[in-house]
Amino acid sequence: ENRTDTPAQSRTVPFVVGAYPMLPPDDEGRSGAAALYAALGDLGWVDGIELPFREALDAPEPWLAEQLAGRFDQCVITAIPGTMGRAGADPVFGLASPDDDGRAQALAYTRSLLEAVDRLHEAAGEQLVTRVELHSAPHHQATPEAFHASLSELSEDFASRGLGMIVEHCDAEGGVGPSEKAFLTLAQEIAACRDTAALITVNWGRSVIETHDPSTPESHVRELVETGLLGGVMISGAGPEETQWAWAWADAHLPLAEHEPTSWLTPERVAATMRAADGAQVYEGLKINTPARASLEDKLAWVSRVRETMLGA
């Protein structure tokens, strides 16, 4: 396959926007969310929305179906909000848990997510979601053997629905500084995904949180390209100082440094990460925070600027 024309080829890769950090606060009646989804659809290059799953999707399935149908057919569900909530309450909860009950709870949780996808598709009358991002919880005690078992056990649940199984790498146990997630290392996740249908997604900010080294996302992407396991490349920032969104080194989806000076996410680093993927990614996208009172126009401008830096590779 010829991958020399990277910008042209990258346009054929589904582009996903994690819009949930940008949703307006106090959004009575969800009118702000509806306007954001419509505006993202009107951009013409957003193929899917990354939707968070906590104990449910963040809006009723019929409402979401109305916003997404006819606009986005490459949506991704991320299990990270619910996984973090459950793992915070139960230290053995997770798909990579060495505790049988904790792993069983995580399998049941994941299947409840898949049932929500079924309801969303039923309401829409079409397939909107193509991939689901899973995570190697629990904190501090995850094992690749348990994670492999879970991914294997879920394979039929995913295949029967035509859904791609994605492992989204987060900061690993043994990283630099106080950890945010302390899940499995990338090498352990690669081992866990072997002989399964799972691919692995790199989130720029989450890889940087692990090492406090802005070259880590690029090296993580290269490693996954070499092993044939690269799923997605998601661009999302991180940084060493407290911001309007969160504390230092939080998983706060910081925007580009030109919009948030403490963010380590620069156009050059984005371009280097995209070059490392070399067109091997099965999807790509971005997830950034914007100020709570940002206008819709400003949100679209910030999102468009990140995409511009991705295409600049």
Spans of features found by a protein language model:
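N-terminal pre-domain/capping segments
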Residues: 1-95, 100-112, 203
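Histidine-acidic metal/acid-base catalytic patches
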Residues: 2-7, 111, 115-123, 149-150, ...
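A structural signal for the main folded, soluble domain(s) of proteins
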Residues: 3, 17-49, 147-165, 186-187, ...
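Acidic (Asp/Glu)-rich catalytic clusters
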Residues: 6-11, 34-45, 58-84, 115-127, ...
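A cross-domain feature marking catalytic cores of carbohydrate-active enzymes
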Residues: 19-21, 51-55, 75-82, 134-138, ...
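Acidic-and-aromatic substrate-binding clefts and catalytic sites of carbohydrate-active enzymes
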Residues: 23-31, 50-64, 140-144, 173-183, ...
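Short acidic/His/Gly/Ser-rich catalytic and metal-binding motifs that mark active-site loops
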Residues: 84-91, 174-175, 242-246
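Active-site acidic/histidine proton-transfer and metal-coordination neighborhood
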Residues: 91-195, 298-307
